[in-house]
A protein has these predicted regions:
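Terminal or standalone catalytic/regulatory effector modules within metabolic enzymes
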Residues: 1-5
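Canonical Radical SAM [4Fe-4S] cluster-binding loop centered on the CxxxCxxC motif
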Residues: 6-43
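Core AdoMet radical
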Residues: 28-47, 51-141, 149-159, 179-184
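Glycine-rich phosphate-binding "P-loop"
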Residues: 63-66, 192-201
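Glycine-rich beta-to-alpha transition loops that act as phosphate-gripper elements at the mouths
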Residues: 93-98, 223-229
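Conserved C-terminal portion of the radical SAM core fold
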Residues: 135-194, 206-224
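A short, acidic, amphipathic alpha-helical segment used as a generic capping/interface helix at domain edges
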Residues: 208, 229-230
Length: 230
């Protein structure tokens, strides 16, 4: 009975080393998307303040890379510290694969929740990505949870998966039972292998959300990418 509003800041965009077929920020595909590196803490603070003023309950820092390098992780930590001191909004992160030490540091910096999506069912995943495994993603979720971070995970629907595979993903989410579930609806990006993928019917999208809510009644569900066009 409550709407939770979260604003994302894509602090590092494009040129990701992974080959996820849906992603316009992968270095494997020519999508014409602008590339930029990490901003300064001051630049992020300005945007975080605006997000809070506009009613956001949380602010999520997202980076398009496989995992943060030690140098980039230090920069992200400085950004988080500045947000904590100067804004006072709940911080969440989506930074790719983490080490145990990095996860513990995020917890120390009062990061509330860590996002790392499964993307799709385990049986579908090899068709979607070949540069890392499904187990790699599960391992990162376990590392984050062991560090005391709340979990946000989910996937993308409309990748060409079957209904059975959507249920497979949902059952995996029910096993993990994250505090937050994020579901994206594919927006086909020109230049990616899925650029010609047919959109899901709205009735199918509603059915998927209904099943997720039925199986995970306590998790926050967030409608993420694709919500504007579906």
């Amino acid at each position: 009975n409550k709407v939770d509003v979260e604003q994302l800041n894509n602090i590092k965009k494009n040129a990701c080393s992974e080959d996820c077929t849906f992603c316009g920020q992968s270095a494997f595909f020519d999508t014409g998307i602008e590339t930029y590196q990490l901003p300064t803490p001051e630049e992020v603070v300005i945007k975080a303040k605006k997000a809070k003023e506009e009613g956001a309950d949380s602010y999520c820092l997202v980076a398009a890379w496989k995992e943060p390098s030690p140098k980039d992780f230090i920069k992200v930590c400085k950004i988080i510290t500045e947000i904590n001191v100067k804004v006072g909004i709940s911080v969440e992160c989506s930074l790719g694969f983490l080490t145990k030490q990095q996860a513990s540091k995020l917890k120390e910096l009062k990061v509330k929740r860590y996002n790392h999506n499964l993307e799709t069912a385990k049986s579908k995943f090899p068709e979607i990505c070949t540069t890392h495994t499904y187990q790699d993603r599960l391992d990162t979720l376990e590392i984050a949870r062991e560090a005391g971070l709340e979990l946000c995970t989910g996937g993308i629907i409309g990748l060409g998966e079957t209904r059975e595979q959507r249920l497979e993903l949902t059952l995996e989410l029910a096993r993990i039972y994250p505090e937050e579930i994020t579901i994206n609806i594919l927006v086909a990006v020109p230049g990616t292998p899925l650029e010609l993928q047919v959109d899901l019917a709205n009735s199918e999208i509603i059915r998927i959300f209904s099943v997720i809510r039925f199986l995970l009644p306590e998790s926050v569900i967030k409608i993420s990418g694709g919500r504007e066009t579906n």
